[in-house]
């Protein structure tokens, strides 16, 4: 017994030392099992993705897809070791089960085929997943573009690589300059210039007729032209040299054989030294001798004519003259009758003016209110009044172009008398567009027309500006 105990003592000693590696292996088993479950869930999720629009619960034939087979990695996993018998007898057959992992059997061949199939399936699923992600990404980008309001491009325009531009018609197309290696140098578009292609002309029938005055239809000739003002349209060259006169006294004009040079306008009033305003010559020549003159030009401008306080009285006043003083008695009359009487009296005295006196004063009030909103100085408003009244007295205004003329006069006066920045000019144009309800493109195009109608005389003498300035300062 002692020998058996002594001889059997070494028997169980290697037993506890052998399962030492086996004791380290079991922690890897749950990890591989968890990986297989994750892979199985991923494959099941990818299989349920429908690329043809069918619901994921139905297959191609309308049948439910079979559940995925169990992963082959589970066959490789070692079963849980049985509990050790009591007493630790070595004669129990406890080793054949783990021996199957190391013994060469037919299972590895089947497992290799299943592994290859699984790899192919995973590869195909990855490819399909990448394709799906690309498709969804493109769709999302398109949805965001269309949701933002940008129009869909039906098709790209054809691109031509040309060397001679005379062989191709580049109308309504974009021209791109490239190098020999086809790298971009510059891209630009050519916009044609002409009276027939003006955007404002196309908008006359659509936008301008929404707010007509007096039920009068708006035409392009009335809106964009002033009566008696000739512009260089349809390729015609028009010279405005007749509106210029020499200011340098050292220049000596010599007569040549072709004819006499035009003499400077006589009796030119000079502005005092240090003044910014350019003097305007008086009209001493008879009407018709100068180019571009009409019936309204022969009368010298009077800044107190349209602002005479006697106009609102009309025929409803009675003048009483006494020995030492004179007084006026005005009877009570309805405002509508007084306004009608005033306009009739004004039309009788100035038959060539197409606007009523009440409408002229209403436009001047709009100009003053606009100048207050834009913080313009009273001298700027006074100059705008002078420009506007000159056009009125010349008979160049009508019901269609009166607002454009008023806006252009304010814009010219602000540019010539104030040191405005770009942002301030933009703000002024926005205010003009909002108050007078016209398009800014029409205003900018009409600005030069008003400048020609004023004979390029934007610098005014003080005797024309000061009366308006005094009245404005009293009102402010």
From Swiss-Prot:
Compositionally skewed regions (Basic residues) per UniProt: 30-40
PTM annotation (Phosphoserine): residues: 128, 206
GO biological process: cell division; regulation of cell cycle
Classification via PANTHER family: CDK5 AND ABL1 ENZYME SUBSTRATE 1, CDK5 AND ABL1 ENZYME SUBSTRATE 2
Keywords, comma-separated and alphabetical: Cell cycle, Cell division, Cyclin, Phosphoprotein
Location of the region described as Disordered in the Swiss-Prot/TrEMBL record: 1-119, 256-295
Record carries keyword Cell division: yes
Family under the similarity heading: Belongs to the cyclin family.
Keyword Cell cycle among UniProt keywords: yes
Pfam families: Cyclin_N
Gene that this sequence comes from: Cables2
Functional description taken from the UniProt entry: Unknown. Probably involved in G1-S cell cycle transition.
Pro residues composition bias: residue spans: 65-96, 263-272
Expression by tissue: Widely expressed.
Oligomeric and partner information: Binds to CDK3, CDK5 and ABL1. The C-terminal cyclin-box-like region binds to CDK5.
Name of this protein: CDK5 and ABL1 enzyme substrate 2
Gene3D superfamilies: Cyclin-like (1.10.472.10)
